[in-house]
């Protein structure tokens, strides 16, 4: 769908070319108006052109406006030094809503779908998922949903840590304690901690662990059998969390790339990209002060080798057009080095294919890194369980008469929605404060606020005995609240574009929060049932319902018919 922003950009671009043909190409600065009384959109380019054209911004604005057709607008005004304020006509907005309703059902398909690989979540085998995995899982899932919605072919990869020294330690510990049936073990994480202590304190244990790493890499049957059982137990616990979060992933761990590591190093050497540094094989880049080490001095490979092999495989075998890796911002330098290496080797054809989607920390209410009182990472399973229980407490407080059956159904939805929305509504680059009290509020920019607006629409349907609301048909706009709601609905595809361009879900959460506020104002100001404009207003309700439902789905949130 052609968004209002792209439509207006095209008009202004054409007008500037006609008014000032001597100008070279320029990037236009057109934005939604900051205040409603300024109109719908604002063009600020007259100020930028003043120096090049040696004219006043206002005179430039007047010439631009003279070349813009008046038909789609109710007004085009020049304000201040040369701001051009555009207000679309009500008839134009009504016609655009007809197109919007059709495109919304299809998902605003892109003209050139791509193969997009999104690598996210990626916990380590034999360790509990903790709050640090929450952001990667939630952000990655949201981006995957958005890319899929507009028609891209998305592969969701879980690059789990299923190889390395840790497994040598675990296998050795299990052999020592004669525990060969891992499925009988309740807490693999505790075993890992015990094995880690032995590894650090007992040189003989460390030696046997290193031997078992080699045995595992060589395909020793006993070592492989134990490794497979360890992975199966861990993946089962991961899947429990993914089911709660309603997240789908295809597991392709680090071990998958083992057969390709030697060839990757050899290929980089053949391209004269490798330098020996203290016995280690490294790839140096002029723009970075440190290299990417791809083979240790003892001949072993590391996670950087695996990442290079994974990048090559995803381009050459998966035929990816874009690759996103969602991890904390602390790994930014590593991924810059990885991209530079893969570009130099030709594994990435050009810049822009790969993006590291970094994110900040989760903090407690004191502004410290979110941990237990003893300083350990908070287990994600415990965090989700607590969210569900606190959501149930909130429901009991607001509805003392709620049945246990309703509580059991609604509690998990409200709790998980709250956690997801609180995370996604924060700019992913920023740290954010985790507060159950704030995220479970019924007012403000919360999941509960979105859900309340959606439930209000369901109430309209029940009260008027309607199974569904109209999402197409003739529409006339009469009241300011109708016009504002129509304009907000039409901004959904451009917000989706922005979310995908910047890889930032908070643009979508901000939009949905604004939409709920505009709908609530419409509901307050515009009588629906029995009014002269009942059908048109039900149409606006129907489009709001579908847009809210779609937006919440893209965030990974679930809806309810009542609260």
From Swiss-Prot:
One GO-annotated biological process of the protein: arginyl-tRNA aminoacylation
A GO cellular-component term linked to this record: cytoplasm
Reaction equation(s) it catalyzes: tRNA(Arg) + L-arginine + ATP = L-arginyl-tRNA(Arg) + AMP + diphosphate
Subcellular location: Cytoplasm
InterPro entries xrefs: aa-tRNA-synth_I_CS (IPR001412), Arg-tRNA-ligase (IPR001278), Arg-tRNA-synth_N (IPR005148), Arg-tRNA-synth_N_sf (IPR036695), ArgRS_core (IPR035684), DALR_anticod-bd (IPR008909), Rossmann-like_a/b/a_fold (IPR014729), tRNAsynth_Ia_anticodon-bd (IPR009080)
Pfam families: Arg_tRNA_synt_N, DALR_1, tRNA-synt_1d
Disulfide bridge positions per record: none
Gene Ontology molecular function: arginine-tRNA ligase activity; ATP binding
EC identifiers of the protein: 6.1.1.19
Motif ('HIGH' region): 123-133
First-listed, main subcellular location of the protein, grouped into a coarse class: cytoplasm
Major enzyme class: ligase
Keywords noted in UniProt: Aminoacyl-tRNA synthetase, ATP-binding, Cytoplasm, Ligase, Nucleotide-binding, Protein biosynthesis
Matches recorded under PANTHER family: ARGININE--TRNA LIGASE, CYTOPLASMIC, ARGINYL-TRNA SYNTHETASE
Subunit structure as annotated in this protein's UniProt entry: Monomer.
NCBIfam families: argS (TIGR00456)
Protein name, per record: Arginine--tRNA ligase
């Amino acid at each position: 769908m052609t968004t209002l922003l792209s439509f207006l950009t095209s008009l202004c671009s054409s007008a500037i070319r006609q008014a000032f043909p001597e100008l070279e190409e320029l990037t236009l600065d057109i934005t939604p108006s900051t205040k409603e009384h300024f109109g719908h959109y604002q063009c600020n380019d007259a100020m930028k052109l003043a120096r090049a054209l040696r004219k006043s911004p206002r005179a430039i604005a007047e010439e631009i406006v003279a070349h813009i057709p008046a038909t789609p607008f109710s007004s085009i005004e020049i304000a201040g030094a040369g701001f051009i304020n555009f207000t679309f006509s009500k008839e134009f907005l009504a016609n655009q809503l007809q197109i919007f309703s059709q495109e919304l059902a299809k998902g605003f398909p892109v003209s050139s779908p791509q193969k997009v690989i999104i690598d996210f979540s990626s916990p380590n085998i034999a360790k509990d998922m903790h709050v640090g995995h929450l952001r990667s899982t939630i952000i990655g899932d949201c981006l995957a949903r958005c890319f899929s919605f507009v028609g891209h072919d998305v592969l969701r990869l879980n690059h789990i840590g299923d190889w390395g020294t840790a497994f040598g330690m675990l296998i050795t510990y299990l052999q020592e304690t004669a525990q060969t049936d891992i499925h009988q073990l309740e807490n693999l994480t505790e075993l890992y901690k015990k094995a880690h202590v032995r590894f650090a304190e007992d040189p003989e244990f460390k030696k046997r662990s290193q031997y078992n790493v080699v045995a595992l890499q060589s395909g020793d049957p006993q070592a492989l059998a134990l490794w497979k059982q360890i992975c199966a137990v861990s993946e089962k616990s991961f899947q429990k969390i993914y089911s709660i979060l309603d997240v789908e992933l295809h597991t392709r761990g680090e071990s998958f790339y083992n057969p390709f590591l030697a060839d990757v190093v050899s290929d980089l050497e053949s391209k004269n990209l490798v330098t020996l540094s203290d016995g280690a094989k490294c790839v140096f880049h002029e723009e970075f002060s440190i290299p990417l080490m791809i083979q240790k001095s003892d001949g072993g490979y590391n996670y950087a080798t695996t990442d290079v092999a994974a990048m090559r495989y995803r381009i050459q075998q998966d035929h990816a057009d874009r690759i996103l890796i969602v991890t904390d911002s602390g790994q930014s330098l590593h991924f810059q080095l990885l991209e530079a290496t893969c570009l130099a080797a030709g594994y990435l054809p050009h810049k822009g294919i790969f993006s590291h989607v970094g994110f900040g920390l989760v903090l407690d209410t004191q502004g410290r890194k979110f941990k237990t009182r003893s300083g350990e990472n908070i287990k994600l399973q415990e965090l989700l369980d607590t969210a569900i229980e606190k959501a149930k407490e909130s429901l009991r407080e607001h509805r003392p008469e709620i049945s246990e059956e309703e509580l059991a159904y609604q509690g998990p939805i409200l709790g998980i929605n709250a956690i997801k929305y609180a995370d996604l509504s924060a700019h992913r680059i920023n740290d954010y404060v985790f507060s159950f009290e704030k995220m479970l509020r019924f007012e403000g920019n919360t999941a509960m606020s979105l859900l309340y607006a959606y439930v209000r629409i369901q109430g309209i349907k029940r009260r008027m005995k309607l199974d569904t609301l109209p999402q197409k048909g003739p529409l006339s706009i009469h009241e300011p609240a109708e016009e504002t709601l129509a304009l907000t609905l039409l901004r959904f595809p451009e917000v989706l574009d922005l979310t995908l361009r910047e890889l930032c879900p908070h643009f979508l959460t901000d939009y949905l929060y604004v939409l709920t506020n505009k709908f609530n104002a419409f509901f307050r100001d515009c009588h629906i049932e029995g009014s002269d404009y009942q059908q048109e207003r039900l149409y606006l309700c129907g489009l709001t319902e579908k847009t809210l439902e779609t937006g919440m789905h893209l965030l990974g949130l679930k809806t309810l018919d009542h609260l």
